[in-house]
Amino acid sequence: MKNIGSKAVIQALLEIDSVCVAELQPFFYTSGWASPIYLDTKGLFSDIARRSIVLNAATNLLKDFVQKKRIDAIVGIEGSGVPFAAWLADRLDMPFLYLRKRPIGWGIKAQIEGNISTNARVLVIDDVTTDAKSKVDACIALRNHGALIEDIFVLVNFDIYPQSESLLSDANLEIHSLVTWRELFAQLSLEEKLPIKKIKLIEDFNKDPITWSSSHGGVGKC
């Protein structure tokens, strides 16, 4: 499955102004990376038409995949991706589970809301992934509670951090997405909505996000 590069999804994301470009100071992700851009998909929450475009594309992509992989449940990770995971679980007529980033209390319910059986095959769904580390951590937490997991699905995969591939490979995981950041940026560039200075800033970031981060006050390794 990997990535389908849906033009309709790209357009929908651009129309809700999901790409936020830093003005004076870079954005700092929770992982510590500094970045000139931040992807915000929350505009889809209240935009029914564009939300439908994205969910239709995701549903069409996932409906055969979950059967082929014999997925038992969909898992949403605490954060802005939870609504998308819940909407897709509903469309796919599948159980939905909610995973907290950190446990609260004791036992399985401290981190997972919803009932999960040992050896259940689950699919993690989120809106965006940058370096994939938080997704890998989430999958490890699920495995510690007895779940079987091989795949992660996101709306947008940055797919520019070189260490992501080894992180995923070492954890026996694969990320699939509707679009990549490069595809989103390519269309944004064509629409000429950003000044040349910002385009160049983002191009420099895309070429070497690790060096860009460390030279702008962020971490320099995963």
Predicted regions and their residues:
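Phosphate/pyrophosphate-binding loops at sites that engage ATP/ADP/AMP, CoA/4′-phosphopantetheine
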Residues: 58-71, 139-148
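Conserved hydrophobic/aromatic pocket- or pore-lining residues that grip, position, or stack substrates
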Residues: 32, 74, 96
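Short, glycine/charge-rich flexible loops or terminal/linker lids adjacent to PRPP-binding catalytic cores
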Residues: 84-123, 131-137
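PRPP-dependent phosphoribosyltransferase catalytic core
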Residues: 2-15, 140-222
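Short glycine-rich phosphate-binding loop at a beta-alpha junction
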Residues: 68-78, 153
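Conserved acidic residues
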Residues: 72, 120, 150
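Active-site-facing substrate-recognition patch
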Residues: 1-65
